[in-house]
């Protein structure tokens, strides 16, 4: 999974502070990609992260690479780059083929009734044998859906769609990644 987002924040912005955004693009945006990986692949038990500043002039890393080892034996990679143009892709490989999702778009600044977020624009399934299937995802306001689900759960309605255990694991995973970025070592995720 890769995530690029030209944040280039002003020096006084919270995203420009290493204390507020450890491991570069991980904390402002990459955590959402980690949530998707946890949802698809289950808990992650070990991580290795390298994170450094190559281009930006603020006190924050712009290039972060994370290797993940899932409890079920799978492996994963998350890269975040905050010094390039925006982009997002997720690719999952299996014995029958692979699926690639890419092209997250967000119409920022549009009135709420016009704003639409497309989590993934193009979806492509490539079987090991046979022709690829490609389709476009429908626009969907992800932020609005998340806030509505939270409000419903807080009001005694249906439970929030992300299990609490996954949320706690995501926080522990983020902490382990930040530790690895600082230590330069593989870190266990409790």
Mark where each language-model region is.
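A general structural signal for well-ordered alpha-helical segments in protein cores
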Residues: 11, 33-34, 143-148, 174-175
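Glycine-rich phosphate/pyrophosphate-binding beta-alpha loops
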Residues: 31, 79-88
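A short, glycine/Asx- and small/polar-enriched loop/turn
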Residues: 59-63
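C-terminal glycine/acidic-rich active-site capping loop/insertion
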Residues: 93-165, 187-190
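Active-site beta-strand termini and strand-to-loop segments that position acidic
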Residues: 66-73, 92-94
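Predominantly a Rossmann-like dinucleotide-binding segment in NAD(P)-dependent oxidoreductases
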Residues: 1-50, 54-57, 184
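C-terminal hydrophobic helical "lid"/dimerization subdomain
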Residues: 167-182
């Amino acid at each position: 999974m890769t995530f690029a987002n030209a944040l280039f924040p002003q020096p006084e912005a919270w995203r420009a502070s290493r204390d507020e955004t450890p491991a570069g693009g991980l904390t402002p945006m990459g955590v959402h990609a980690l949530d998707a990986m946890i949802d698809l692949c289950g808990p992650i038990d070990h991580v290795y992260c390298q994170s450094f500043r190559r281009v930006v002039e603020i006190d924050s890393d712009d290039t972060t690479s994370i290797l993940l080892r899932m409890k079920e034996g799978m492996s994963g990679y998350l890269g975040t780059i905050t010094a390039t143009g925006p982009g997002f892709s997720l690719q999952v490989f299996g014995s029958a083929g692979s699926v690639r999702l890419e092209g997250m778009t967000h119409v920022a600044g549009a009135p709420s009734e016009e704003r639409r977020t497309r989590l993934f624009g193009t979806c492509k399934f490539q079987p090991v044998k046979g022709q690829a299937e490609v389709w476009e995802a429908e626009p969907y306001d992800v932020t609005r859906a998340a806030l509505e689900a939270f409000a419903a759960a807080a009001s005694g309605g249906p439970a929030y769609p992300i299990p609490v255990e996954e949320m706690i694991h995501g926080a522990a995973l983020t902490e382990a990644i930040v530790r690895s970025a600082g230590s330069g070592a593989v870190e266990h995720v409790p």
